[in-house]
């Protein structure tokens, strides 16, 4: 499904919800912009470059503060006097009366002004509306156009730290789109402050355009060789799935500033993936699902595999492995010594195809035969639904010296149809760590393969099916730690996430075949599953965790022996931080994402005795905008349901009046391991609803979500939707009792998993608490979703048929008890298939249910962008909600035809 960890207010996220995944794939309101001066991977997705215009909404807010306005009707101020010769006594009485009335009015206004001021101050003090949103009550209302077009997006830079050829730390790769210095260069972080000499800088590409045989090319992405002598350049990139793309590839020589095709025999060939050897002497790449090798000392290209094609992938993932396992376009891994290449061979010949039909466009690029242009373009995707055959994956190795492909069998492994390979990490001396999951993702086998000797052994087994009945999370955060006897590390080892006392923590396994870790972290809090940074010289590990609160993220350090846990960020204040460390761990790009206006700076780490600090970004434009707009207050609090403490955020309109009654909109995602309630700065659709429409918006992260411990997270296994819906309903009941809430106007909405949860909540509640709902791209039956994701949380349909029946949206009578609900879906959704919505409509038809609306977006995928569709989604959500909260649907249902 599409995920999002919420990044600047995304409305939907992939079902593959892991915090280390890029959130920028398809974010409905994520409008991050990145300055080209500091960059990482090039973005080949141009979704957010689209300009979105605002739909006109009613000028007046139906819930403005009418109750504090003076009446202006038939009174003394407007009534004409009947006798112009009134005596002075009468006038004096009127004057005194007016003065008293005026004094009373003034006192009333001052009282409420002071009360509201005290309320705002209390919110700021208690809940940290140190959140920038909540600090302004006066100004212009937000516009939907401004929210959608990126005006409120924070500027955020990514630094691509690189290792110097001679081990220098603090080197970064920079791209300058304006080419004021050079298009692509490597320089020391100190050179930005003129603190270094020229030898610590390399100009890699002087210009962003380069010519080959008289044809000018523009880079889509660039990867310098480790020795900085060449640059691998992708041009003419065309997106495939969420992360993958194809392009023409070129080898750019730094000395001569000239380029040649990666494969001289096929310069126009579309390549899926290419990567440098650690020694900079070769490139391995995949084309047409076969693996090739180009050594730089020759123009010859060697074909390593020959079985690749429609059903077999070598070195790149198929759809489900890209979406649900690796979150990237690569399943190719060079050994550290450059002698071997490990790659995944994926055979999906037994995986059924699912057709995606395009009615308005032709993504295939193929012109139909004459007379057939009225038929849709059809793309068939190998998509394993729950219970269907999975692709069969095997780990293969290529021996560079002997030009041989082989595999290593480790006894006791899972059968072909019961095996997922989720992580491959090279160690030293030709050894590699491999994680294998069973199909239902509740048993992990970690094996250590000695590639030169072609042997392997089982080093760890994590059996969650027996331990707590939960699932194993897919991560790519295992970090190899090389031996250094002189520095207290006699053996190789690795850092990995482990479960300790019901929470995710870091463990250090040394030697690599040791199954008992050194515990690096512990306690009733959890670490973020992004790869930790390691300062090998000082045996220090840096990581991000939610130690202070589930809604916060801070950066910490700990020694490899598990001692001296220290915060790197200010934990005395609510904060949400991210960090990117230099290769040697001496510098860090610290990114503060909220609750105040985001900023970024590069600093030295505590082990680096050379003080350094440079502010990279302050988002001054956001600070200026905040002063001009009336933003909602965000009140963070907890709610306890069934003895489980859950995180809640309530967004109140800027001119909130506690004596009024406000409609309430619940927004949720709610997928396993996800998180929507956090302290990031965000001005999104929810902000617009509170600021401009004047409604309260509430989000609760229910059971099943992230950073609340495994007991509360894994309780949802086998019956997705039940506990999550219960938490939404119980929270809504609590809000319905609040004196400022209009309990007859409570709605819920979500996208993707949030769409499923919207329908499941409406079904389970049956109109008792919620009256309205809006579901976008929802799953309606988990048998329709992909196997790897679904079976992780639901087991297989064969093992859990009852759970699948219960989790499906099936009680149409219950849905009929709601006043009205809305369902929207893109017809070309390759993630959550349109089949889900069609199945729901069929059930509604058979039950004779009519209290719903449907909007379909032709040729739109899960993000719903095609042909202005994204704007239309939010226009429809907004106008539909206004109609609901002004009783438009109830009035419409009561209209009878004239006879």
Swiss-Prot record:
SUPFAM superfamilies assigned to the protein according to its UniProt record, in alphabetical order: alpha/beta-Hydrolases, DPP6 N-terminal domain-like
Indicate the transmembrane segments per the record: 92-112
Q: How does it sit in the membrane?
A: Single-pass type II membrane protein
What is this enzyme's EC?
A: 3.4.14.5
> Mind telling me which InterPro entries this protein's record contains?
AB_hydrolase_fold (IPR029058), Peptidase_S9_cat (IPR001375), Peptidase_S9B_N (IPR002469), Serine_Prot_S9B/DPPIV (IPR050278)
Residue ranges that the UniProt entry lists as topological domain Vacuolar? 113-899
Q: Where is the composition biased (Basic and acidic residues)?
A: 61-74
Residue intervals on the Cytoplasmic side: 1-91
MF terms from GO for this chain are:
aminopeptidase activity; dipeptidyl-peptidase activity; serine-type peptidase activity
Q: Which residues form the active site?
A: 752 (charge relay system), 829 (charge relay system), 862 (charge relay system)
UniProt name for this protein: Probable dipeptidyl-aminopeptidase B
């Amino acid at each position: 499904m599409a995920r999002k960890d919420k990044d600047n207010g995304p409305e939907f996220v992939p079902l593959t919800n892991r915090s280390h995944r890029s959130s920028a794939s398809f974010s409905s309101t994520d409008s991050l912009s990145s300055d080209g001066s500091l960059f990482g991977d090039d973005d080949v997705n141009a979704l957010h470059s689209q300009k979105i215009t605002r739909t006109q909404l009613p000028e007046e807010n139906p819930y403005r503060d009418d109750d504090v306005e003076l009446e202006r009707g038939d009174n003394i101020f407007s009534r004409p006097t009947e006798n112009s010769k009134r005596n002075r006594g009468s006038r004096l009485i009127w004057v005194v009366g007016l003065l008293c009335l005026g004094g009373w009015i003034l006192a009333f206004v001052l009282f409420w002004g002071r009360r509201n001021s005290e309320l705002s101050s209390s919110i700021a003090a208690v809940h940290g509306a140190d959140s920038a949103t909540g600090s302004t009550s006066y100004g212009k209302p937000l516009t939907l156009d401004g929210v959608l077009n990126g005006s409120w997006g924070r500027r955020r830079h990514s630094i691509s730290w690189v290792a110097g050829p001679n081990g220098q730390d603090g080197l970064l790769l920079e791209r300058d789109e304006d080419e004021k210095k050079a298009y692509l260069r490597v320089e020391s972080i100190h050179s930005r402050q003129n603190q270094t000499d020229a030898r610590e800088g390399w100009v890699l590409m002087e210009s962003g355009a380069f010519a080959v045989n008289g044809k000018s090319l523009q880079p889509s992405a660039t990867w310098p060789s480790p020795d900085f002598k060449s640059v691998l350049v992708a041009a003419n990139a065309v997106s495939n799935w969420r992360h993958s793309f194809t392009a023409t590839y070129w080898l750019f020589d730094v000395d001569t500033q000239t380029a040649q095709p990666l494969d001289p025999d096929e310069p126009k060939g579309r390549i899926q993936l290419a990567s440098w050897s650690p020694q900079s002497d070769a490139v391995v790449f995949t084309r047409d699902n076969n693996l090739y090798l180009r050594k730089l000392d020759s123009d010859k290209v060697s074909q390593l595999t020959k079985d690749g094609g429609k059903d077999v992938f070598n070195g790149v993932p198929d759809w489900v492995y890209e979406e649900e396992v690796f979150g990237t376009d690569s399943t190719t891994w060079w050994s550290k010594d450059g002698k071997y290449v490990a790659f995944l061979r994926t055979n999906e010949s037994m995986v059924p195809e699912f057709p995606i039909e395009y009615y308005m466009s032709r993504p295939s690029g193929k012109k139909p035969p004459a007379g057939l242009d009225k038929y849709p373009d059809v793309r068939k995707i190998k998509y394993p639904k729950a219970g269907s055959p999975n692709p069969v994956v095997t780990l293969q190795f290529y021996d560079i010296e002997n030009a041989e492909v082989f595999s290593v069998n480790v006894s006791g492994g899972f059968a072909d149809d019961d095996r997922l390979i989720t992580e491959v990490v090279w160690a030293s001396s030709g050894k590699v760590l491999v994680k294998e999951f069973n199909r239902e993702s509740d048993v992990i086998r970690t094996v250590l393969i000695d590639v030169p000797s072609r042997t392997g052994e089982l080093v760890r087994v994590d059996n969650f099916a027996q331990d707590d009945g939960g699932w194993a999370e897919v991560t790519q955060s295992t970090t190899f730690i090389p031996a250094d006897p002189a520095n207290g590390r006699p053996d190789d080892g690795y850092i990995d996430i482990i479960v300790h006392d019901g929470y995710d923590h870091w463990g250090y396994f040394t030697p690599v075949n040791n199954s008992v870790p050194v515990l690096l972290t512990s306690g009733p809090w959890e670490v973020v599953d992004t790869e930790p940074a390691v300062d090998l010289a000082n045996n220090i590990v840096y990581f991000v965790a939610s130690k202070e609160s589930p809604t916060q993220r801070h950066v910490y350090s700990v020694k490899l022996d598990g001692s001296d846990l220290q915060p790197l960020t200010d934990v005395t204040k609510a904060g949400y931080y991210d960090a990117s460390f230099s290769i040697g761990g001496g510098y860090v790009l610290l990114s503060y994402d909220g609750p105040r206006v985001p900023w970024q700076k590069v600093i030295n780490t505590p082990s680096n005795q050379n003080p350094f600090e440079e502010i990279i970004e302050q988002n001054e434009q956001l600070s200026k905008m905040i002063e001009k707009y009336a933003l909602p207050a965000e009140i963070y609090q907890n709610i306890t349901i069934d003895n489980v403490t859950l995180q809640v955020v309530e967004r109140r309109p800027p001119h909130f009046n506690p004596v009024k009654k406000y409609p309430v909109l619940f927004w949720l995602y709610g997928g396993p391991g996800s998180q929507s309630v956090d302290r990031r700065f965000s001005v999104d659709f929810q902000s617009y609803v509170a600021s401009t429409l004047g409604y309260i918006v509430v989000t609760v992260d229910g059971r099943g979500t992230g950073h609340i411990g495994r007991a509360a997270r894994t309780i949802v296994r086998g019956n997705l939707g039940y506990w999550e819906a219960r938490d939404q309903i119980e929270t809504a009941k609590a809000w319905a009792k609040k004196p400022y809430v209009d309990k007859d106007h409570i709605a819920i909405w979500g996208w993707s998993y949030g769409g499923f949860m919207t329908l499941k909540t409406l079904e389970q509640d049956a109109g008792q608490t919620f009256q309205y709902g809006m579901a976008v791209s929802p799953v309606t039956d988990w048998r329709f979703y992909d196997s790897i994701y679904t079976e992780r949380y639901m087991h297989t349909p064969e093992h859990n048929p009852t759970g699948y029946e219960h989790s499906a949206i099936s009680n149409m009578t219950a849905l009929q008890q709601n006043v009205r609900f809305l369902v929207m879906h893109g017809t070309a959704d390759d993630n959550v298939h349109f089949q889900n919505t069609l199945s729901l409509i069929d059930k509604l038809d058979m039950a004779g249910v009519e209290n719903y609306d449907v909007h379909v977006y032709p040729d739109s995928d899960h993000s719903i962008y095609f042909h202005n569709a994204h704007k239309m989604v939010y226009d429809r959500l907004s106008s539909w909600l206004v109609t609901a909260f002004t009783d438009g649907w109830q009035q419409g249902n009561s209209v009878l035809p004239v006879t």
